[in-house]
């Protein structure tokens, strides 16, 4: 009786994805960081001229479209701004890296010795980018429906966890999470004015998440004004990011 063959490393990854590549070179390319040496070269001498960044570009668009469609179908009465915020939370670098870690994606990546020694297999940005590249590779290999199935499998828990009555209300927290996921500093809030008698005072607050970007908010309390300022700042950031992707 023949012993059952143990799956190879990449076969284990395919099992975790529940998708088997017909073009194995696409899978290899998706897992190749730009620091990886060319085959046969010494580490650090010649870096790969083919790496996963173009696939990452493609996978980013594929992922955004699929997640956008899922949110659009599930939340029929939710306005565009709120859908954009939920999508940003689902596909930000930290969220992607967590999905990548569940797949143990770091262990399969090809990268240079220096990058690996500096913790490259655990870096949020590298893991998130590799996951997007993987989705781009699946799209090229099996088409959009195959990519949809994999995204649904990987992100089902996150999408199911969104509850309209609980999410999207604390804009200060949403803004903080958005910035932290991108490795940016926390926003700076400042009270611009506080006018009127104590029982009818109106506060105007500014929120600076980045040097050249500012949100403004008004409210009957400082906290309410900060929430409105954070909401506007977050919407401006998402709008800027969407324009960048376009």
UniProtKB/Swiss-Prot annotation:
Subunit structure comment from the entry: Homodimer.
Compartments, record wording: Cytoplasm
Record family assignment: Belongs to the ribonuclease III family.
Predominant subcellular localization, coarse grouping: cytoplasm
GO MF annotations, alphabetized: double-stranded RNA binding; metal ion binding; ribonuclease III activity; rRNA binding
Protein name in the entry: Ribonuclease 3
Top enzyme category: hydrolase
Binding, Mg(2+): 56, 129, 132
GO biological process, one term: tRNA processing
